[in-house]
Amino acid sequence: MAVVPLLLLGGLWSAVGASSLGVVTCGSVVKLLNTRHNVRLHSHDVRYGSGSGQQSVTGVTSVDDSNSYWRIRGKSATVCERGTPIKCGQPIRLTHVNTGRNLHSHHFTSPLSGNQEVSAFGEEGEGDYLDDWTVLCNGPYWVRDGEVRFKHSSTEVLLSVTGEQYGRPISGQKEVHGMAQPSQNNYWKAMEGIFMKPSELLKAEAHHAEL
């Protein structure tokens, strides 16, 4: 699915000049930066040659690669209404826009570091419960200028990059994997993308807090 047509939808706020509330919301399409290694979460129709054999997930330095867009959705078997703010501690799915597969993990070993494999799984946005990740952050909501961690809801590893680099056919891309221990390697930040306008509920809460 191409990213450009999303710009034609109503109720969107771009990354620049958006809401002063600055929250990340369901339905937003974003790139996620690993702040330690300065790479964006990425996938493509290239499968692992070991482990699960599923679609690989990597980190890339390119800012412009369209294969780094992910749609934020509710956890498996739930609907998260467009514009609903993501709460700290909330389970979500991240669906790769161009291939329709979800960020996924399981008890396979990653090919380079020997940590837990992270892959992209499913068809047209539908996979299984191993696609669920819990957003770890400070405060009530995931805010766009803040760093977050993603904890795999089933195996409890943290989405991480530690710098291992692939050769051909994806030369220069970094391994993305799951790690049990928190560290600077598992912080992420929302960067470029299309951010859905926060729901009226959050605006009402913010107005009430100001009174």
Swiss-Prot record:
<feature type="domain" description="MIR 3">
    <location>
        <begin position="139"/>
        <end position="193"/>
    </location>
</feature>
<dbReference type="InterPro" id="IPR016093">
    <property type="entry name" value="MIR_motif"/>
</dbReference>
<dbReference type="GO" id="GO:0005783">
    <property type="term" value="C:endoplasmic reticulum"/>
</dbReference>
<feature type="signal peptide">
    <location>
        <begin position="1"/>
        <end position="18"/>
    </location>
</feature>
<dbReference type="GO" id="GO:0051787">
    <property type="term" value="F:misfolded protein binding"/>
</dbReference>
<dbReference type="Pfam" id="PF02815">
    <property type="entry name" value="MIR"/>
</dbReference>
<protein>
    <recommendedName>
        <fullName>Stromal cell-derived factor 2</fullName>
    </recommendedName>
</protein>
<keyword id="KW-0732">Signal</keyword>
<keyword id="KW-0677">Repeat</keyword>
<dbReference type="GO" id="GO:0101031">
    <property type="term" value="C:protein folding chaperone complex"/>
</dbReference>
<feature type="domain" description="MIR 1">
    <location>
        <begin position="21"/>
        <end position="75"/>
    </location>
</feature>
<dbReference type="InterPro" id="IPR036300">
    <property type="entry name" value="MIR_dom_sf"/>
</dbReference>
<keyword id="KW-0964">Secreted</keyword>
<dbReference type="GO" id="GO:0051085">
    <property type="term" value="P:chaperone cofactor-dependent protein refolding"/>
</dbReference>
<feature type="domain" description="MIR 2">
    <location>
        <begin position="83"/>
        <end position="138"/>
    </location>
</feature>
